[in-house]
Amino acid sequence: MKKILSPLMLAMAFASAGSAMAQTAPAAPDSTLSFNVGAVSDYRYRGISQSRLDPAVQGGADYADKSGFYLGVWGSSIKWIKDAGGDSNMEVDIYGGYKFTVGDIGYDVGFLRYEYSGNKLNPSANTPELYGAVTMGPLTAKYSQSTGNLFGFSNSKGSLEFGVVGVVGVWSLE
């Protein structure tokens, strides 16, 4: 009996130690607020330099609610507005939208406004844009369309962009 009881007691001790160490994961927050800041050697947007091949300072803030709604603001130093006769050296993007999933497919719909205070261009460089994206696994397809003139170009209302991006692997530095 002593030989049976010892292994049984040992097994029970290990089982109870494991449950004592198990912890409940913290509940997801109702909302998140995050910030970012950085510097780049050349700020490019859709392949075009926004800083005339010079460095740019950038930063932003994002708020997301667990319901899927989000709002954000992002800014960068720029130079191209001055080249066009304007007086703005700063781009500020204001955006908001709604993200949700159905099964394994993620969706994102939103509105984005590129704002260049003091640009004084006619037509204005300020650009409103609607967008929608679909994500399946590592691939995301996104469609964006301006609802006004695009970055100060006359008769450019309705300009669009479509792109597909994907993750090809995970990298880490040690």
Describe the role of every protein-language-model region:
Residues 2-8, 13, 18-174:
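Outer-membrane beta-barrel proteins
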